[in-house]
A protein has these predicted regions:
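A short hydrophobic beta-strand segment most commonly corresponding to one strand
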Residues: 175, 227-243
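A short secondary-structure junction signal
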Residues: 121-127, 134-137, 167-174, 182-186, ...
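Fe(II)/2-oxoglutarate
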Residues: 1-24, 274, 280-284, 288-334
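Acidic, His- and aromatic-enriched active-site or binding-groove loops in soluble protein domains
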Residues: 127-151
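Non-heme Fe(II)-dependent double-stranded beta-helix
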Residues: 1-136
Length: 334
């Protein structure tokens, strides 16, 4: 199965091949060694763990019960707690390459850390956001066109923070099931759950791997049968044409991270990090205050912030300009 889904970080793989594997192939990819700096992952893991302990709760898992821990909005929270780590972590080249291959240049990253404790329960097999979260009765009301479009608007991913052997519960995948035409309607049914448990595949993960899969593939996180916790940062990467699951505080991301970008000279890395920091799409907006420009779309926030970085614009000036830009997009009744 490795040759169907595994790509090594130093392989030269085309955009078309990435897209084909996710759409018509196995439906999943593992990028071995996508993060070469394992000390970076350790530092980010420490930041996540401190935040989880500080919040003192065990956030719910949509598809599993028990004492597993969740850290919602791990993107904003890393910017708040360890902004010096943000660019290297969320600006990873493979994260950008696969996201752009599936969604194009306008995409939005959200992230939720999942810690599966020893003995932690597995998830039930499911499809993911958007329609994977809808009850069957509502999915049945959706036109077939929308069901097919749902999986094209999101990419699921995970940054692997520790070695995950099979007994620790790497993601269970029903390879090729992303093309089951009625999957969003049927995945909860007992016969489909039985099929999933009978036919799923698992591949061990290594610390530093990146995992991606089509959101409509039938999948589930496995149970942790070891004595060590499993820490993975789950990524939901959305097309700018769709609504992501989480709300992001973009001004806070700029406020915390931009000063650290000024110390970085790697333009490609900075450009990728900026994709994770600001709104990927200029709509919705208040067209009275923010009227269409000659090119209709106007200047994207990603373009604006990269120009500011190139000019070494001060953090205070950037934040003031950004606040004004955001305010122009909001309609307020008199």
């Amino acid at each position: 199965m490795d040759d169907q889904i595994v790509i090594h970080h130093d392989q030269n793989v085309s955009v078309d091949e990435i897209r084909e594997r996710l759409e018509n192939g196995a439906g999943a990819l593992i990028i071995r060694g996508a993060y070469q700096d394992l000390a970076l992952l350790d530092s980010v893991s420490d930041a996540f763990s401190e935040r989880i302990q500080g919040e003192g709760n065990h956030a719910a898992d949509h598809f599993a019960s028990g004492s597993n821990q969740r850290l919602w909005n791990a993107l904003n929270k890393l910017a708040e707690d360890a902004p010096h780590l943000f660019a290297e972590y969320y600006g990873n080249e493979w994260l950008h390459r696969v996201s752009e291959a599936w969604l194009g240049p306008l995409y939005q990253i959200t992230a939720q850390v999942n810690v599966v404790v020893p003995g932690g329960a597995p998830q039930t097999g499911h499809r993911d956001y958007h329609l994977g979260f809808y009850p069957e009765s509502l999915v049945a009301e959706m036109p077939d066109l929308i069901r097919r479009a749902s999986s094209k608007l999101t990419l699921q991913g995970a940054i692997i923070h520790c070695d995950v052997p099979v007994e620790m519960g790497p993601t269970k995948l029903l390879l090729g099931s992303q093309n089951d035409s009625d999957g969003y309607l049927t995945y909860r049914r007992p016969e489909e759950q039985e099929r999933f448990e009978r036919e799923f595949s698992q591949v061990p993960f290594k610390k530093g791997d990146l995992v991606f899969f089509n959101p409509s593939i039938f999948h589930a996180a496995g149970g942790n049968k070891t004595s060590n916790p499993r820490l993975v940062n789950l990524l939901q990467i959305s097309s700018a044409l769709a609504k992501p699951m989480e709300h992001l505080d973009f001004p806070a991301l700029v406020r915390f991270v931009y000063p650290h970008l000024l110390n970085n000279t790697d333009r490609n890395l900075v450009s990728r990090a900026i994709r994770a920091m600001v709104d990927a799409y200029p709509f919705p907006s208040n067209l009275d205050l923010d009227p269409p420009s000659d090119d209709w779309l106007g200047e994207l926030e990603t373009t604006w912030l990269l120009k500011a970085w190139e000019k070494k614009t001060s953090p205070s000036e950037v934040l003031s300009d950004y606040t004004n830009r955001r305010n122009r997009r909001v309609y307020r009744s008199a």
